[in-house]
């Protein structure tokens, strides 16, 4: 995979994480009355048309009997109209707006005003005024759009298919008439066997050529994985043949036995491959973390873990791939003294309850919290500035769990060897500046 592909995959993963986080926050929000507006505009729709609809809704809301609810709804509609004014046309992927007033856990009212362009086209139009935000259309954006190739091959022919999400597509079918194992007429057994093997060889070559035609674009595979299926040993022979494209051989994730050929075999192959299809991301995650562990086992010096060393690697431009547990709870604080002096500290959910960490030891002055942000979000917003790609991982695999428990859920693969111990001799930050204490994950 090229560096461009790596970057595109990293960017897509980060956008998915941002949407996932947004959905979580929106679903937790609740309001009084029906003052929470969910507005989703499809690509190609007209801003003027949506403005007209909001103006009509404003007129209707003016008749709400409850004064408190009426003012809340009118305020939310006005906020949505103001957000809409920021756009002269609907963005290429559509527009999602959430406006309203939510009630915090402390019972206080907090305004919510969000407008985003999704990372891929959203095919839903929605306007709802409720006591909650409606996020189902955003959730649909997170459904996998990975494509998987299927080759169903037996002695009667081959089918080339594609599966993307829940959509199956038959790309091409061929039929073949191979001689049976027994001879006919006066043909010698040896000559007949040679003829049969030649036709079989040509058949495998034809299927291999078509596989490259359908599943390779611009010299690289266009599918995330490839499944070979069939009722005889053709599928195994195809996958091991020298005629089968090496680039596609590396993409084979499963070989399955099916009772039929053609469309019925395609459907059966999809059913039998369900588990491996759902675990492709899981497999990619295991591979990435295993690579991280391998660097450590070989003591290459081309790895980092923990907040302090990872931030140093980023500052040096040495980090190639940043690996972050998506549920890491560490918070990044930007603090400022009345004198103007600033510093950054990182605290977990227990450490931030200690008021002493927000007080300067020398002067006794209290720090002002200028910025408070989950470190995961900070990485998502800033990883590009350091020339790194960002990979989110879970703790659901054995490797992922070990990465979170043993390495704090944060690490990286480096472009070149870095001696962090030597760097620390020259640069000893304040102990709070990169607070790298163990956390309860």
Swiss-Prot record:
One of its GO terms (biological process) is cytoplasmic translational termination. Its main location: cytoplasm. It is found in: Cytoplasm. Keywords: Cytoplasm, Protein biosynthesis. Pfam families: eRF1_1, eRF1_2, eRF1_3. NCBIfam families: aRF1_eRF1. Belongs to the eukaryotic release factor 1 family. Heterodimer of two subunits, one of which binds GTP. This is Eukaryotic peptide chain release factor subunit 1. It comes from Dictyostelium discoideum.
